[in-house]
Amino acid sequence: TYEPENRLVQELAVLREIQMPVYSVSGNHDEQYPGPPIQKLLAKALSENNVMDIEGKIIEFDEFRLVGIGDLWAGKANMRFLPELPQDKPWLILSHNPDTVDMVPELPSHPLMLSGHTHGGQIELPWVTSYIMKRVSILGHKKGFYSHENADVFVTVGTGMVGVPFRFRVPPTIDIIELI
C-alpha cells in the first residue's frame, strides 16, 4: 500500500477479475504503522475493485464462519467477543498479523487464522532472518502453518515488500487453501 495514491485503484484491479468473493482486513501499513495516511483512499480502491473489507464483521458460509480482525499494531485486534457468538460451526479468522493468534480465546472449535504481515522475512539469509524475525515479531512466524493452544495460523508470504523493493530466496506467493 505504498503505491502512489493515484495508482491504488489500478494496482488492485487484478482482484476484480477473481470470480469469487474477495475479503480483506487492514494491515499495519494500511493503518499508518508505519505508512502514509491512505485509509480512505485504500477503502475506495478496494470497494471499486469489489473487495469487501470485513474488519469487525462476520461472513456466514454453510460450513463455517469468517471473521475479520483489525490490525494488532493499530490496537484493533479484539477477539474477546468470539466466545459470545454462536459456536455451532468452525471459525475462520482473517487477521493481518500472525502474532494475533495468541489472542484467540478458547472456543469449542479450534479456529484457523489466515495471516500475512511477515513477507516471509523478505530476504532469507540462513540463521540471520530467523534471528531478526524473533526480535521484530512476538512469535517469529515467517511462513506456513503453525499450531497454537487455541487456534492454528497459516502465514502467507504474500506479494508485497517493505523497505527495499527486493526479495531474496522468498518468492512472492498467492496461497490457495482448500478447507475440508
Residues of each region from the PLM?
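Short, surface-exposed loop/helix-turn segments at secondary-structure junctions
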Residues: 127-139
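Conserved catalytic scaffold of divalent metal-dependent phosphoesterases
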Residues: 30-112, 118, 136-180
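His/Asp/Glu-enriched short active-site or ligand-binding loop at hydrolase and phosphoryl-transfer sites
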Residues: 120-125
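Membrane-embedded segments
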Residues: 1-52
